[in-house]
UniProtKB/Swiss-Prot annotation:
Domain of life the protein comes from: Bacteria
Keyword Transferase among record annotations: yes
InterPro entries reported in the protein's UniProt record: Ptrans_KptA/Tpt1, RNA_2'-PTrans_C, RNA_2'-PTrans_KptA, RNA_2'-PTrans_N
Record-level GO BP terms: tRNA splicing, via endonucleolytic cleavage and ligation
One function term, GO molecular function aspect: tRNA 2'-phosphotransferase activity
Protein name (record): Probable RNA 2'-phosphotransferase
Sorted UniProt keywords: NAD, Transferase
Biological source species: Flavobacterium johnsoniae (strain ATCC 17061 / DSM 2064 / JCM 8514 / BCRC 14874 / CCUG 350202 / NBRC 14942 / NCIMB 11054 / UW101) (Cytophaga johnsonae)
Length: 182
């Protein structure tokens, strides 16, 4: 399998399954699921050659496990990261005592004042380890790793969810729960 093609398809799937399904005329249900056959057909019509084999490859080999099938592989959705309103039906889960967030220097002043906000997404994304947070932060420049006192947040009433691909999600992280030196 050509990795460049797989990466291109993965990026396109992120666009249509997380942010803009209307770009190809795709309908997602309230839980973010799309019909696999409809997705393949509409992607192909828009010039993104996709078949079941390539889709399987992208879903199974994506390093971040961004996509998931339902049990019979007739539907697909993004695991998290939506900017459109979907209900992922994730159960509230007690987090680890500390979680991590990767960002870059230009956002630090705002984060110190306002904390971590979900911005255009449905949740703030947190990692269980610093290594993952470094990778996330590195996508935009020199990473700054924030340690989040998630256990304290949970005890104070904040809700946490664990996505299908092991990304921790919460609605916000106020500055008092963030350690800025790690």
């Amino acid at each position: 399998m050509n990795e460049n093609i797989a990466k291109s398809i993965s990026k396109f799937l992120s666009l249509v399954l997380r942010h803009s399904p209307e770009k190809i005329g795709l309908k997602l249900d309230e839980n973010g699921w799309a019909d696999v056959n409809e997705l393949i057909e509409k992607c192909t019509k828009k010039g993104n050659r996709l078949d079941a084999e390539l889709l399987d490859y992208v879903v199974e080999n994506n390093d971040k496990k961004r996509f998931a099938y339902n049990e019979d592989k007739t539907k697909i959705r993004a695991s998290q990261g939506h900017s459109i309103s979907v209900e992922l039906n994730l159960a509230e889960t007690e987090p680890l005592e500390y979680l991590y967030h990767g960002t870059v220097g230009k956002f630090m002043e705002s984060i110190q004042k306002e904390g971590l906000k979900k911005m255009s997404r449905q949740h703030v994304h947190l990692s269980k380890d610093k290594e993952t947070a470094v990778k996330v932060g590195s996508r935009r420049g020199v990473p700054q790793i924030l340690t989040v006192r998630s256990g304290a947040m949970y005890r104070d009433g904040f809700k946490f969810y664990l996505s299908e691909n092991n990304v921790w999600l919460t609605d916000e992280v106020p500055p008092k729960y963030i350690e800025f030196k790690s």
